[in-house]
Amino acid sequence: LDGLVGSEMCIRDRDNTMATQAICQPANYGADIIIYSTTKFLSGHGNAMGGCVVDAGKFDWNNGREFEKLTEPDTSYHGIKFFETFGNLAYINFCHASALRDLGTTMSPFNAYLTLTGIETLNLRMQKHMSNADEVANFLIKHDKVDSVSWSGFKKNKSYQLAKKYFKFGFGSVFTISVKAGFDGAKKIVENCNLFSHLANVGDTKSL
């Protein structure tokens, strides 16, 4: 996609929630803004809600027509010009100074504490997540009732070479399966699973 952009004024935004910075660092491959749902793998225990915006600090925001919030005076902050004051870190400082103030999306202190505690073990947890995914995916692909398993760790998967290129280790811990029994069969599997929980979260201490 970056090759198709063709404009230096296009911001490259990446959601790195599923890989995390433990195995993939988009800023090293041209991303300008990286976002995370910290509720998932970063906190790692399904007990803290939050989100994160990371500014790679490489994008030139000095374009009045496109980014006037960053280049023109902000009257709510005594006329500060964010780009003039912070340079290429204008966007992240604007997010902190204005967006948080206006929208109120501030993480609670206890959620922040739980998230930071979880991040301390991120590297080890991601390795275990991926080794578990490897075993389960390889078990399922051989099952006579499974039609297909889509996981970047399989050499025949269309994302295999990309995962090898961009991931420091492993192939991620999330995959999808298609069962031969179709929708009704898949529904029956979900309803009768005991070890795996049918929940909206990922990256938990539980198998989801």
Predicted regions and their residues:
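Active-site beta-loop-alpha junctions enriched in small/polar residues
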Residues: 17-19, 154
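Active-site C-terminal subdomain of aminotransferase-like
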Residues: 33-174, 178-190, 195-205
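Generic detector of well-ordered alpha-helical packing
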Residues: 3, 16-17, 41
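Single conserved hydrophobic/aromatic residue that forms the stacking wall/gate
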Residues: 1-6, 11
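Active-site core of PLP-dependent enzymes with the aminotransferase class I/II
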Residues: 7-8, 19-25
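Glycine-rich phosphate/pyrophosphate-binding loop
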Residues: 208
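Hydrophobic beta-strand scaffold residues
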Residues: 12-13, 34
